[in-house]
């Protein structure tokens, strides 16, 4: 999944708004322990819910997480996954060293650590089977089981849900899960992910820290394509932000980190509490009211675009509460002289009213997005191809 120093935030780290970027408490990328989350001890909700209301929220969110897990288990048990090849599941772990003294797990040879977070670490390994590199997220099950992310939920639940979600998905703009290694005799748990060894197609036009329109358009097209696929499969990412977008050597963007994602049975994507990164949080999420997960993801796309174009956050306060207040109440400021089509797109994505906010379908067809490449077409995914093949067979 991970590439060395190729998160958007690191590319733009020369600009102050990214140098002090706040991490979601779940996010292992860019690998530092989190410093600014919903559980920071500050008031996280301008609506000011009382303790009874917070308890009700907790029960509701726990129920939502359990429903996500039940939906995912049902999909996996019945083969309802959008993957041509299933994720490999390995229940036997063998540790050792190669002839050069490098540590090994099964057929993977350790090369170097490429990151760490509050849950575990990410290490670059090379496979002796295909000689390819893989990014392996390593966890200790005992640590995850003790680590509370909510009064009734542990980090182990987050990781297992992330694994189940990634087992059901396959898309060129989404990081691919290759294998899960979970030996009951060991405390270790491994997620083997594709390694994105990319170089930035960085265009230094525009303000310091920004990417410029050409690169931003290219990247945003990939983000929208991947997110449209997720939403079509009833998956809400929940934490779209530059840190979770990785770029390949060919300039393709891949969405990663599904640790706070949720799955729905149908179009009912209503959520109550946002576990994502505060500065990317939609206004309705700040108010402690029920909101649409899809619409909140779309707002986060808007914040990401704003960052890519202008090199700063649209709303940022000195404290968590101040940030939420600005997201809810402050007007959106866009500098004069910006491309009118780009301005229109940013305003549509960052519309505070979720009912008036631009949809991803509208974004895919927006003039600034289409440019010379045309509208973003719907991806013909594995489950869609399979359904079409079955339909053709029934007609033949």
Swiss-Prot record:
Gene3D superfamilies: Transferase(Phosphotransferase) domain 1. It catalyses: L-seryl-[protein] + ATP = O-phospho-L-seryl-[protein] + ADP + H(+); L-threonyl-[protein] + ATP = O-phospho-L-threonyl-[protein] + ADP + H(+). The modification Phosphoserine is found at residue 261. CDD domains: STKc_LKB1_CaMKK. Keywords: ATP-binding, Cytoplasm, Host-virus interaction, Kinase, Nucleotide-binding, Nucleus, Phosphoprotein, Serine/threonine-protein kinase, Transferase. Residues 108-369 form the Protein kinase domain. Activates SnRK1.1/KIN10 and SnRK1.2/KIN11 by phosphorylation of their activation-loop 'Thr-198' and 'Thr-176', respectively. Required for the regulation by SnRK1 kinases of the transcription of a large set of genes, the modification the activity of metabolic enzymes, and the control of various nutrient-responsive cellular developmental processes. Functionally able to complement the yeast elm1 sak1 tos3 triple mutant. This is Serine/threonine-protein kinase GRIK1. It comes from Arabidopsis thaliana. The gene is GRIK1.
């Amino acid at each position: 999944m991970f590439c060395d120093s190729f998160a958007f935030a690191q590319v733009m780290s020369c600009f102050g708004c990214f140098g002090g970027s706040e991490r979601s408490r779940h996010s292992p990328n860019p690998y530092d322990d989190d410093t600014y989350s919903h559980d920071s001890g500050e008031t996280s909700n301008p609506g000011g819910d009382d303790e009874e209301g917070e308890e009700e929220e907790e029960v509701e969110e726990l129920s939502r997480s359990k429903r996500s897990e039940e939906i995912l288990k049902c999909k996996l048990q019945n083969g309802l996954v959008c993957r041509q090849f299933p994720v490999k599941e390995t229940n036997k772990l063998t540790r050792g060293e190669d002839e050069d003294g490098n540590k090994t797990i099964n057929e993977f040879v350790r090369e170097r650590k490429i990151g760490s977070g509050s849950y575990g670490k990410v290490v670059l390994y090379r496979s002796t089977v295909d000689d390819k590199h893989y990014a392996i997220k390593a966890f200790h099950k005992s640590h995850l089981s003790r680590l509370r992310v909510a009064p009734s939920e542990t980090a182990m639940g987050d990781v297992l849900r992330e694994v189940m979600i990634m087992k059901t998905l396959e898309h060129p703009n989404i990081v691919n899960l290759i294998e899960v290694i979970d030996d009951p005799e060991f405390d270790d748990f491994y997620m083997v992910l594709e390694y994105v060894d990319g170089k930035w197609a960085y265009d230094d036009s525009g303000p310091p820290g920004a990417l410029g329109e050409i690169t931003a358009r290219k990247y945003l097209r990939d983000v929208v394509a991947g997110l449209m696929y997720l939403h079509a499969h009833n998956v809400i990412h929940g934490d779209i932000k530059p840190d979770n977008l990785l770029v390949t050597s060919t300039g393709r963007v891949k969405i990663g980190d599904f640790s706070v994602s949720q799955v729905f049975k149908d179009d009912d994507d209503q959520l109550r509490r946002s576990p994502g990164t505060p500065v990317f949080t939609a206004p309705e999420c700040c108010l402690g009211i029920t909101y649409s997960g899809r619409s909140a993801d779309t707002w986060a796309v808007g914040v990401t675009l704003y960052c890519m174009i202008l090199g700063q956050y649209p709303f940022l306060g000195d404290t968590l509460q101040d940030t939420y207040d600005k997201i809810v109440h402050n007007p959106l400021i866009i500098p004069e002289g910006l491309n009118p089509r780009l301005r229109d797109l940013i305003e549509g994505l960052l519309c505070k009213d979720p009912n008036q906010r631009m949809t991803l379908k509208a974004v895919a067809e927006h003039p600034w997005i289409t440019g010379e490449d045309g509208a973003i077409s719907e991806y013909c995914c594995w489950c869609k191809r399979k359904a079409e093949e079955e339909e053709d067979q029934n007609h033949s």
